[in-house]
Amino acid sequence: NRLLCEINKFFEDFEQSEFYGKKAYDMNSNDPRVVCAYGELLVLTNRAEEGTDLLIKAYELDPVGMGASNADKRLGDVMFGSYVKGDYQQCLVYDKKIGRKQPIAWAAKIASLESLNQSQEKESELKKFAGTYPDLVLGEEIDKLHFQDTTVKQTMKDLVS
């Protein structure tokens, strides 16, 4: 069920993704992989408050996650959820705990800084991102996200540019 949630989320069939995600969560609400998958779906479908709570729960259940060598992925997920729900300070708090940020975690941090009118810090982070990922364009990374409401994606892209 968790995998069907992920697959349907990728193809933007949010109704089916939620069906399988909720089913998986109801069957095993303490499996961090299930909690994370369902939490990500909720963040992408305009229920960021609940989704971020689940992402934090997944981090607390298993900070490192199966196959990972550190907690950076889970922390990045929480940063992203915090940004989407509008808790920019929480995003920055979790940023202090992360080691190497993935592009979406960078986008969440940079968009949060812009939302908090911290332009100098935003510019500094944009330069750090470009140095860390010289071949990536942040807007293109945001385009890879599967938001149900595309205005959320566009707002994020506008804030990081």
Tell what function each PLM region has:
Residues 5-8, 13-161:
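Alpha-helical protein-protein interaction modules
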